[in-house]
Amino acid sequence: MMDPCSVGVQLRTTNECHKTYYTRHTGFKTLQELSSNDMLLLQLRTGMTLSGNNTICFHHAKVYIDRFEDLQKSCCDPFNIHKKLAKKNLHVIDLDDATFLSAKFGRQLVPGWKLCPKCTQIINGSVDVDSEDRQKRKPDSDGRTAKALRSLQFANPGKQTEFAPETGKREKRRLTKNATAGSDRQVIPAKSKVYDSQGLLIFSGMDLCDCLDEDCLGCFYACPACGSTKCGAECRCDRKWLYEQIEIEGGEIIHNKHAG
């Protein structure tokens, strides 16, 4: 059995090291093998303090560097305006945008996150970004932008490094959880656990986020019980029920394929 990588250890996601979801190969890279740009992206997307001697497994390299943008399925909602997930017509925040917008709004924005048209419109309306401003921030991505990003103090908010709105609101907007059992979750008999002690689905071993997106790296506040950002209103560890469906922006219903 291969040892976990430094990234998995620091993020407490050692159970995900060496998975073959996104690559058929297993192994390690030292961080000094990464380009300076990839190293910077990794630091910003994980919130970690890294050194060249640290290692990253091929799975975590895919998740946080190569496929990070593809895995962001919804608007990062920097202004806390969405009651449901916004997943349509998303715009990727690049390295230069992250520096510029983080400085302008004083909010943590990570390159690779995405904005919906509504949030983009708010940004364009709130900030006078004329052509001169854009030219000032675009050409120098290897110099001033990198220095500015390194100078920003980012706390690590978890696996997906989401901007954290006011306490409690993310869970309210991510899940529509009715008080009556069985309406949006499937209740399993009291003696039958659906999740194991690590929060994995017992029948498949899958680390499924409560938003029901199988590619999601975690979009909730860190669970007070286990620290995972994949637990919704209640910790998944040893849980005896799972969500049957959720409703996202636009009224679309996502059904849990594992609820049957």
Curated annotation (Swiss-Prot):
Function: Through its interaction with ARL14 and MYO1E, may connect MHC class II-containing cytoplasmic vesicles to the actin network and hence controls the movement of these vesicles along the actin cytoskeleton in dendritic cells.
Protein name, as recorded: ARL14 effector protein
PANTHER family linked: ARL14 EFFECTOR PROTEIN
Keywords attached to this entry: Acetylation, Cytoplasm, Isopeptide bond, Phosphoprotein, Ubl conjugation
Gene coding for it: ARL14EP
Modified residues (Phosphoserine): 183
Keyword Acetylation among record annotations: yes
Glycyl lysine isopeptide (Lys-Gly) (interchain with G-Cter in SUMO2) crosslink site(s): 177
Keyword check for Phosphoprotein: yes
GO cellular-component term (any): focal adhesion
Superkingdom of this protein's organism: Eukaryota
Organism the protein comes from: Bos taurus (Bovine)
Modified residues (N-acetylmethionine): 1
Subcellular locations according to the entry: Cytoplasm
